[in-house]
Amino acid sequence: RSAMTDAPDRPQGCIDRVGFVADVTPDGQAIAQGQRMTKTWRFRNDGSCPLTEDYFMVATAGLQPGAQRLFRFGTTIQPGQEGDVTISYPVFGSGTQRVDFKLSNPSGTTFGLGPQQRGALWTEYIVQ
């Protein structure tokens, strides 16, 4: 199966909706250039689809050209439950950096946080 295809266990007609609970890893960390930024968010699955390892965090702005843009969830969060999602990537540049993200289901449909699926999600850190 490719990285972004329909998952066989995805309930037909289910709704993707994710609520933000907390930044487990706070923004504003100082990181040396070339080191890895590791960010963890706590989400609540407010939809009817299980959020599985076939979901992704998708970087939509702020990364270097050619950088990895898809990051697997690496966990499953059932509807009505909370769970942590962690991503990691190398940092470049200097000063305050921000990378914006959306979520993506196994079909490749991207969406944001909240009831309207438009809520913003990002990492912000200082490269030294």
Question: What are the language-model segments listed below?
Answer:
Residues 40-46, 88:
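Short edge beta-strand/loop segments characteristic of extracellular beta-sandwich folds
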Residues 7-21:
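Proline/serine/threonine-rich low-complexity linkers at boundaries of modular beta-sandwich domains
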Residues 67-94, 106:
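Intrinsically disordered, low-complexity Pro/Gly/Ser/Thr-rich segments with frequent PxxP/GP/PP motifs
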Residues 34-40, 96-99:
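Short, solvent-exposed loop/turn segments enriched in Ser/Thr/Gly
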Residues 17-23, 59-73:
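Short beta-strand and strand-turn-strand segments in soluble, beta-rich domains
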Residues 53-54, 93-128:
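Terminal connector regions
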Residues 25-31, 74:
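Short beta-strand segments of immunoglobulin-like
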